[in-house]
Amino acid sequence: MKKLLLSLFFLVQIICANAKDHEDIVTENLNSGGFTLISQSKPVSVIVADNDKKGVLIAVQNLQKDFERVCGKQAQLFNSPTSDTKQCIIVGSLESPYVKQLIKAKQLDEKELKGKVEKYIMTVVSNPLPGVDEALVIAGSDMRGTIYGVYELSEQIGVSPWYDWMDVPVVKHQNLAIKRGSYTAGEPAVRYRGLFLNDEAPCLTTWVKNTFGTEYGGHEFYARVFELILRLRGNYLWPAMWGWSFYADDPLNSPTASDMGVIMGTSHHEPMARNHQEWARHRKEYGEWNYVTNQKVIDEFFREGVRRSKDNEDIITIGMRGDGDTAMGAKEGHDDEFVPNDDETIKLLEKIIKNQRDIIAKETGRPAKERQQLWALYKEVQRYYDKGLKVPDDVIILFSDDNWGDIRRLPSPEELKHKGGFGMYYHVDYVGAPRNSKWLNVTPIQHIWDQLTLTYQYGVDKLWVLNVGDLKPMEYPITFFMDFAWNPKRYDASNLLEHPRKFCAQQFGESQADEAARILNLYSQYAGRVTAEMLDASTYNIETGEFKQVCDEFVRLEADALRQYLSLPENARDAYRQLLLFPIQALANIYDMYYAQAMNHKLYAEGNPEANVWADRVEKCFERDSILCRGYNKEIAGGKWDGMMIQKHIGYTEWNDSFPKDTCPKVMRIEDAEDKVGGYVFKPSAGFVTMDAEHYFTVKNPQDAQWTLIPYMGRTRSGISIQPYSANVAGSSVTYCFDLPEGVDEVEVRVITASTLAFQRKEGHRYTVGLEGKEAVEVNFNGELNEEPENVYRIMYPTVARRVIEKTVKLKIEKAGTQSLVISPLDPGVVLQKIVVDFGGYQPSYLFGKESDCKR
């Protein structure tokens, strides 16, 4: 007894101390005293009874392949001990003859499994079967418990649940051993944990067609989805239903789910195990979806669904909504125009539910309460429940969020007496008002944690289902949702950030985990501010610098992600690109595009020809968006995900993506801006004006020469000079106009030129600076740029190293308003770059300040 208590204590310690499920229990050191899994690239053999559950057998076959991924060779599979199974892995559910034998020999404690739900135990046993010296035993309380134990071992040897759906590389090992001990993840806190593939056109549907050659989701596609769900320790799925019909499209879909161990359901508006498309495709034959006028046909439709699903684990949705996911009585897509009579609808729904349960009882041959059902309180249906609609006591009542991840309703203490329990339908993808959210993952796990913690603490723990759209690119929220549904108590506010770190460690390795998790957390925070579909030029304040701030944050994040991407081994880059680099680049580019549009509109309204530069930037960003998406479709994993990133996301004018294709945001251009010369008038800000030299008001050209723009010269934009340099500069000048407020009686003018040496006039080259109509000040700007002892280190070297010369002149101001500053070269080689007019606010700056606003 004492020995048993000690082993149970150790078991509890394992549960409490380790991550999903157990950290640091596998080693490459075969001399560590552990149980050998791989030795010199040869994996240990596996024994499983041939009469065990099909789902167990399929999982074991996948384990064989996982060993091959890790060491290059498949584990041999046997149905009974042989000479090759002296050391082996034994896998079995509680019904397995081998597990029964171990229990009978008291090598497994039956109490740890019997009556438990989806629990596994993984432990090393000596002499478990005749002819077997030692085995790693994976025993499950039921089929799924066993499957979870098998896939836990797969994770331990280095195969991520996302090896297929995110192309996570498998680390190769020649030797592996598992530490001795008893390991379990216990039972799940939430009984049914699943996904809803929804809003699947055009991305998922196109990818499936490109990958499997079908216009629907067939069993080969769904088998990959089921495997992912099981590797993540989920057990439930609502299949895609916009244009597909899970049950009707491929007769192998449902058996594949049953064989693999996934429980099927239908969405909140698809009652009685029937897909909406099964009705929509036969409307002419069936008539209208109206229970008042067409009950006989609808009841038969319901009977066929239950009859088809009576021998599997499918959870049957009951209730009824309108045709096409609308309120009962409303036309498809016109919920907002419909004014229902709630009292009549409640009576009708109660009648429908009673009739549905009669059908369930008759078709299954047992009381309706013995077949699991759920009723979804989605949108208007919650109102009926609040007004007193009666729900049978054995039915799961499924609450929902507001489609944006905020919980609408939770049960009261009195309602918790409902024996059927409560569920939650949660979204990280949505089609609906105020605007679709389909393109990228924009839901921070902090928000999911907050709302699902609330959900769990209020007793909603029977069923959780997550609307994941096309499944990709929701890899991380799916993982967090499944982990959290298994054990909501595991993460609180103090340790929540451990989850993204552990997730990144599993996908990219320990050495990359901290940085990848930091980038993932920042992306989630930035993306969670506003969806890409809701973002536009007016979202952030451009005047306060807020818009530039958020764009700069994305620029830095993109640089960090690209830096880490380039540091990864080649085989990890596809996974990193899917999880982090693509969404960061895509959203950073969208932010840049709308910021550019905001700047374009602002400068256009001011008459500033720089508006055209920003218009060009909008168009370049729009083009880059298509390049990024094309790269996702055509380049990642050799084009494996072709079609998965074709969702429209630019051009919304209403809630839906009814526009034909992505549309470049509207820009405005100042006509003939490139042909127009001069005319700039600057506005002061914060006590100074900064002007790029090319933005003059007027110029005067000398005979046989002209002022010429030198693009990209200098520290910010460009330079201007008289060309050719050999020309006589007499009579030339350039004038800059700017406004000054009342109360300014003196300004300090800083003229920034290129660091031209005195190549012609040894005493130095000169220009004059003055206000129009006033006496100008002569400036010798390079007379001290020489190698004389008093100049070489003090002036020349520092100046030429900075490549600019800054000279300061003070000028008196007689009146406020528009001023005209005239600069006239007296010698050749003057290259003007920037002019700063300071009247009390300028702070010395290496780039001489951001150019002031102007009009033209």
What are these regions (language model features)?
Residues 230, 235-238, 244, 252, ...:
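Structured mid-domain segments that build the active-site/substrate or prosthetic-cofactor binding neighborhood
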Residues 170-177, 241-242, 248-259, 286-419, ...:
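Gly/Pro-rich turn-and-neighbor structural signature
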Residues 654-856:
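Extracytoplasmic
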Residues 38-53, 205-209, 324-338:
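Acidic/histidine-rich, surface-exposed loop or edge segments in extracytoplasmic proteins
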Residues 108-293, 310, 374-378, 388-406, ...:
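Feature activates predominantly on carbohydrate-active enzymes
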Residues 1-22:
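Bacterial Sec-dependent N-terminal signal peptides
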Residues 548-682:
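Histidine-centered catalytic/metal-binding microenvironments
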Residues 20-187:
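Contiguous, structured surface segment used for ligand recognition
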